[in-house]
Swiss-Prot record:
InterPro entries reported for this sequence: Bee_toxin
Keywords: Amidation, Calcium-activated potassium channel impairing toxin, Disulfide bond, Ion channel impairing toxin, Neurotoxin, Potassium channel impairing toxin, Secreted, Signal, Toxin
Modified residues (Histidine amide): 45
Region spans: Essential for toxin activity: 40-41
GO cellular component terms, A-Z: extracellular region
Record localization: Secreted
Disulfide bonds: 28-38, 30-42
GO MF terms held by the record: potassium channel regulator activity; toxin activity
Organism: Apis cerana cerana
Protein name, as recorded: Apamin
General function of this protein: Neurotoxin that blocks voltage-independent calcium-activated potassium channels (KCNN1=SK1, KCNN2=SK2, KCNN3=SK3).
Tissue: Expressed by the venom gland.
Length: 46
């Protein structure tokens, strides 16, 4: 039971962290990148 709860909480935290990093990148404004991550992503895509 405890291991299952731990697994679920780990899964949820991974989803939250991924969402936190992916969402700003998806809506990046390459003309004026708000974050360093955006700037790097914009450079990769040309």
């Amino acid at each position: 039971m405890i291991s299952m709860l731990r697994c679920i909480s780990l899964f949820l935290s991974v989803i939250l962290i991924t969402g936190y990093f992916v969402t700003p990148v998806m809506s990046c404004n390459c003309k004026a990148p708000e974050t360093a991550l955006c700037a790097r992503r914009c450079q990769q895509h040309g």
